């Protein structure tokens, strides 16, 4: 399970250094193999260990290519999916087209989200956090049953 937000830097080649606290888990569970794709709802990237991504691929394969909405989701997620292998120094090369999509330059937030990471431009991440907090403070809609049962 991945949790927490960590500031990491992209080097001049577009590689990010995976924090050491995640490296052993990624090597053990995915032999360092990751898949990066776009987030279709936010200006960030999604970074999955390969076994987790294969579950997503199975779900995507069950969508209908005849349904325009389902086909669009398949096209966006699979069409942007890029495999990346963690090197011996614990770095991952993020494809240029993906970096461009998320506006990633130097400072990047690596955000743990259970079975995957989100990769955000640092400034965009903090703007999103502020928007999310503001939205929660002004909530007028009814919470879903699952959120009502969540006790923090």
Swiss-Prot record:
Keywords: Cytoplasm, DNA-binding, Repeat, Repressor, Transcription, Transcription regulation. Coiled coil: none annotated. GO terms for cellular component: cytoplasm; nucleoid. The keyword ATP-binding does not apply. It is found in: Cytoplasm, Nucleoid. SUPFAM superfamilies: AbrB/MazE/MraZ-like. GO terms for biological process: negative regulation of DNA-templated transcription initiation. Gene3D superfamilies: Transcriptional regulator MraZ domain (3.40.1550.20). GO terms for molecular function: DNA-binding transcription factor activity; transcription cis-regulatory region binding. It comes from the Bacteria. Negatively regulates its own expression and that of the subsequent genes in the proximal part of the division and cell wall (dcw) gene cluster. Acts by binding directly to DNA. May also regulate the expression of genes outside the dcw cluster. Belongs to the MraZ family. HAMAP family: MraZ. Forms oligomers. This is Transcriptional regulator MraZ. It comes from Citrobacter koseri (strain ATCC BAA-895 / CDC 4225-83 / SGSC4696). The gene is mraZ.
